[in-house]
A protein has these predicted regions:
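An N-terminal, well-structured beta->alpha segment
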Residues: 1-4, 21
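Glycine/threonine-rich beta-strand-loop-alpha-helix active-site module
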Residues: 14-117
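Carboxylate- and glycine-rich phosphate/diphosphate-binding segment that chelates Mg2+/Mn2+
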Residues: 88-157
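Short beta->alpha junction loops
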Residues: 3-13
Length: 157
């Protein structure tokens, strides 16, 4: 078992490269992400780059992941991001000074283990932020306008 426990909030792009370099030497059969949304997004990005190589920025946008990645098991310890069930990983790109997304059905976890007991040790402030995040996602999903299917569209904003 190889443990990478240096995940930072909003997953800085360059930290993914450090994780992947360590993991490649280990040659894992699967990736398990345990933690909040950033930990799960890091796990998705690690599974992607271990499987397909290249640079993370090669996959920005939608449908650029060429095929299945290493199996991913997602174990959320906060409630709010929904990363354990979405086809999206969000990272911070210092060159763009913004968050960017990678979206592909190949990023969906093979299994999500959602145990509410794991959220019980979260600090109250983090629990409140995660709850607000969940509410924001729900409102956004309900009110968002439909958009075209152009895969480059997310990168044009």
């Amino acid at each position: 078992v190889l443990v990478h426990d240096r995940v930072q909030p909003d997953v800085p792009r360059d930290t993914v490269a450090v994780c992947v370099e360590e993991a490649r030497e280990f040659a894992p059969d699967m990736v398990i992400g345990i933690g909040g949304g950033s930990c799960l997004d890091m796990a998705k990005c690690a599974a992607l780059l271990i499987s397909h190589g290249g640079l993370l920025q090669d996959y920005y946008g939608e449908f650029k992941v060429p095929g299945p990645t290493l199996p991913l098991i997602a174990v959320p310890t906060t409630a709010g991001t929904g990363s354990e069930v979405t086809p999206v990983a969000v990272i911070s790109d210092p060159d763009r000074t913004m968050k960017v997304g990678i979206s592909s059905p190949h990023l969906i976890a093979a299994a999500a283990i959602c145990d509410p007991e794991l959220t019980m040790t979260c600090p109250p402030g983090l629990t409140a932020i995660a709850g607000a995040d969940a509410l924001t996602h729900a409102v956004e999903a309900f009110t968002a306008a439909r958009r075209g299917t152009d895969p480059g569209l997310p990168q044009q904003h």
